[in-house]
Design a protein with these regions (language model features):
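A general "terminal functional-core" signal
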Residues: 2-6, 13, 37, 65-305
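N-terminal low-complexity, Ser/Thr- and acidic-residue-enriched intrinsically disordered segments
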Residues: 1-57
Length: 305
């Protein structure tokens, strides 16, 4: 039996971003179809939606109220790229709560790792701001639950999305209980994530990749910069912001990674916290490369490649 579960709920497909938006339900449908095509039948975790208390550990009350009101009353979006409608409120609570439920399952020993295949994504959402397709910061909500509720002292977040996770950095920049490490394209949206930004007691790390660099640079940066930092930090739990938009065919990035590179990155970091890993889907907008990269990532988590 697989030791790696997934998180998925059909309700998140109802988060309607319109016919031309890159972050659509077709992304998740493509991933699940690829799992079926590869004859992968992972266990699906039962989850609970995030509570207001869960969200308040990361987000301001004003932000939470604004998102709820915008969704329920169909108001003008706070950010033009970040579309939301009536079903978006439930989807966002399930995406954030699913990350917490995944962490619970790993801590309880039910699974070694969990891959959350949900939407909307989260790493651009700041404590008081929705942006970049993200309403709430799913991985930050999970990390704050791990340190505030469970009482872990050191949680690591590895973000390999082609875009810098400005929201995650902002949430934990002054909190040494969470080490945020991002490798991302620069210059690129959202224009953040600089190497000199090291956070409290050097628990923030940004590695910038110029557009079009050889994919080998990604792997050497992980081996020579991120892994030594994580080993020094000795995390008790690893969270991964799994964005697949650094793939060579992704329309929102200009990098050269392929499916096997996401598996290689996953294998490089997955053991850093004794094998306790929860991965949360972020970006990836070419449906075929997103789907195949997600399969490779899952198989690496499950020790199959």
């Amino acid at each position: 039996m697989s030791r790696t579960a997934i998180v998925f709920r059909e309700e998140v497909l109802l988060h309607d971003t319109g016919p031309y938006h890159p972050e659509s339900s077709a992304r998740l449908e493509a991933i699940l179809e690829a799992f079926e095509r590869h004859k992968i039948d992972p266990p699906v975790l039962e989850i609970e939606p995030a509570t207001r208390e869960d969200l308040l550990r990361v987000h301001t009350a004003q932000h939470i109220d604004t998102i709820e009101r915008t969704c329920r009353e169909n108001l003008e979006y706070p950010d033009p790229d970040t579309v939301m409608g009536e079903a978006s409120w439930e989807a966002s609570l399930l995406a954030a709560g699913g990350a917490i439920s995944a962490c619970k399952a790993v801590l309880e020993g039910k699974y070694d790792s969990v891959f959350e295949i949900m939407r909307p994504p989260g790493h651009h959402a700041e404590p008081n701001r929705a942006m970049g397709f993200c309403l709430f910061n799913n991985i930050a909500v999970a990390a704050r639950w791990l340190v505030d509720v469970v009482g872990l002292k050191r949680v690591a977040i590895f973000d390999f999305d082609v875009h810098h996770g400005n929201g995650t950095q902002k949430a934990f920049y002054d909190d040494e209980r969470v080490y945020y490490a991002s490798i991302h394209q620069y210059p690129h949206f959202p224009g953040t994530g600089f190497p000199e930004e090291r956070g409290k007691n050097n628990t923030n790390l940004n590695i910038q990749m110029m557009p079009g660099v050889p994919k080998e640079l990604w792997h050497s940066a992980i081996e020579s910069l991120i892994l030594p930092e994580f080993k020094r930090y000795k995390p008790e739990f690893l969270l991964i912001s799994a964005g697949f938009d650094a793939h060579r065919y992704d329309p929102l990035g200009r990098q050269n990674l392929e499916e096997e590179d996401f598996a290689k990155m996953t294998n490089a970091v997955k053991g850093i916290a004794g094998g306790k890993v929860v991965s949360v889907l972020e970006g990836g907008y070419n449906l075929e490369s997103l789907a195949e990269s997600s399969v490779a990532h899952y198989l690496a988590l499950d020790n199959e490649i």
